[in-house]
A protein has these predicted regions:
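Glycine-rich phosphate/pyrophosphate-handling loop used in enzymes and phosphotransfer proteins
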Residues: 1-212
């Protein structure tokens, strides 16, 4: 993914990339849900990071905090989650909460925002009947950026990096948490962010916008 990013920085400087994203619609993305397993956890992604439009979307969101990018990601999620949640509500008594992978304090200070929180803010406008909260998980240690690390290093980097908040610990056992991240590669972040919930008896759907 880092090679893609370096190439994109040459071909699409940030300002040009942001302009390109502003011209995109949901129809410009091929949504193809893909699920893979990491240990005992199934992780789902919706887009391939190999797609140029997806690369522009994620980088504009991640490094510019683009409202347009966040809104596009939210719309892509809405189309997928509407069906998933409807099926869940029909077949079970689960109560759905959508949350995001928390960003470390240092990283958030550097960027000035949490990109997945921006997505959830837009998603709440589209799914107002579903509870959306960023008060379920906290990141308990600062971690290195994952992009330059090997698979083993990625897993070690985020191991035990997340804990439940007081609110998270109090979730009823019939809660179904949809845990959102922007992009996943080996699934390490979503896996370790899910663990405090699953260890507390909560069912989780770890879900990334893109995989690559």
């Amino acid at each position: 993914m880092r090679l893609f990013d370096l190439i994109l920085d040459v071909i699409f400087p940030p300002s040009r990339r942001e302009k390109a994203v502003q011209e995109l619609t949901v129809e410009d993305f091929f949504v193809h849900p893909h699920t893979f397993a990491l240990n005992d956890t199934n992780i789902t992604s919706l887009l391939s990071y190999k797609d140029k439009n997806v690369q522009n979307l994620i980088r504009t969101l991640k490094y510019s905090g683009s409202f347009t990018a966040a809104s596009l990601c939210a719309k892509i999620l809405e189309d997928f989650l509407t069906e998933e949640i409807a099926e869940l509500e029909t077949l079970s008594d689960k109560s759905v909460i959508i949350t995001s992978v928390p960003l470390g304090k240092k990283r958030k200070q550097e960027r000035g925002f949490n990109q997945t929180a921006l997505i959830l803010k837009e998603l709440h406008k589209m799914l107002p009947h579903i509870e959306i909260s960023d008060e379920i998980l906290i990141r308990t240690k600062e971690t290195k950026p994952q992009t330059t690390l090997s698979r083993k290093e990625r897993l070690e980097n985020v191991a035990n990096a997340f804990e439940l908040t007081k609110r998270g610990k109090a979730l009823p056992k019939n809660t179904f948490v949809i845990l959102i991240d922007d992009v996943t590669t080996v699934g390490a972040t979503l896996y370790f962010a899910s663990r405090p919930l699953t260890e507390n008896g909560i069912q989780v759907l770890p879900l990334a916008i893109a995989h690559g």
